Amino acid sequence: MRHANKRGAARLAAVQALYQMDVAGSGVFEITAEYEAFRLGKEVDGALYREADAQWFRAILTGVVEDQKTIDPVIRQALTDDWPLSRLDSTLRAILRAGVYELMKREDVPVAVIVSEYVDIAKAFYEEDEPKLVNAVLDRVSRRVRGEGRGKDAS
């Protein structure tokens, strides 16, 4: 599997783990150990998890947890006034938190790659407007934190 595909699998696994932490109230160390031992690259209930870059997975997961107090206000600022962060479901919050973490902390990864990867993850969970929301929020955040966007300004 190509390096980029392993990172994509790590991003998806990180979003799933963040969701699980949010819903079940699990801790980051417990979830990281569970995913690395039983999920990444393994078969679970007949479904095969893609092989993932475990280091990338850990970096996203621990980074989001450590920086959530910084990440959430950035997301709130990028959302429209009628869409508070608390109104978003756990999956969407996990996608946005992971994407914003990478935009803020992983300057070695191009904006277009980050936005595209997380929009694709959103498309795996949603069919309607949520992928567009992920695109718009991450584009706004990228303009704010990196001074560059992916496309038209959705503000």
Curated annotation (Swiss-Prot):
GO cellular-component terms in the record? Answer: cytosol
Biological process according to GO: DNA-templated transcription termination; transcription antitermination
Q: Does the keyword RNA-binding apply?
A: yes
Sorted alphabetically, which keywords does the UniProt record give?
RNA-binding, Transcription, Transcription antitermination, Transcription regulation
Instruction: Offer an example of a GO molecular function term for this protein.
Output: RNA binding
Task: Give the matching InterPro entries.
Answer: NusB-like_sf (IPR035926), NusB_fam (IPR011605), NusB_RsmB_TIM44 (IPR006027)
Function of the protein = Involved in transcription antitermination. Required for transcription of ribosomal RNA (rRNA) genes. Binds specifically to the boxA antiterminator sequence of the ribosomal RNA (rrn) operons.
Family to which the UniProt record says this protein belongs = Belongs to the NusB family.
- Protein's recorded name: Transcription antitermination protein NusB
